């Protein structure tokens, strides 16, 4: 970081503002910097430059207390991409402390807590941890495919899935969700899933949007009732499928299932309707995989779960997730009839054919 290096300290208080624990933390800055890269991509068309994380000092408490941080990618004379990261970015660190306090008996489970974060300048300490502290200058592959009109896809919207807002539109053909649901039904009592590939486009007027073009079922996985593990063979298989398509597609996210009807042991239909397992959720294991593989600010996740409807039995549900300010949140997706995606692929296939004379 220009001017020095910052260390961050987390303090956790009970509802009576009594300090329970204070500790140094090492935030994972990659999602925050990905959010800044996405801003740079949308505003100046580049993601390569000097990357910084700087504290945003608390407006009333002042230094060393912060209200968040500012992630920035400076691409030189072309400009920069910057985004303000809120305090909720540090919530996982607070949750980890709370878990330890509950286990030690210092805090009652369910008790409300407060937390604060402070930043301290350490000017003479060298930067040693990539994406933890300081400034970085890296070369990255640009995920933007090019310019395209979003109107082509908006006119084919048939429905929406997921809840919450959306910092950019995502279009998914219904046929892809049908494929995923068929995979879910065939998996029985274990989780299953796959990778969704497609393109990140930029509409000159409306901004960026993602188009999902295909679903690649994940093979060579370790599937359990409450966990799906992708192996090196899984990723090799997916990459081979992408290369065979030769459509310039890239990972835009993943789909996996929560077989809630298997998890639910409620004896009566009325209790099944309100079963906690049937609620939409993105587990800590899900979040870990998303962070490790799908950390790009434009990359998304879809979860197929189950909900019990009185008189109708179990029904598949869809929930959507994605990045917003470096944090995984619930979000909405548009479901299309897939006609534009299909026509584009068929046109490319036709143009790629060679006729022997």
Regions found by a protein language model. Name each.
Residues 1-251, 259-357:
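Conserved beta-strand-loop surface patch within small alpha/beta domains used
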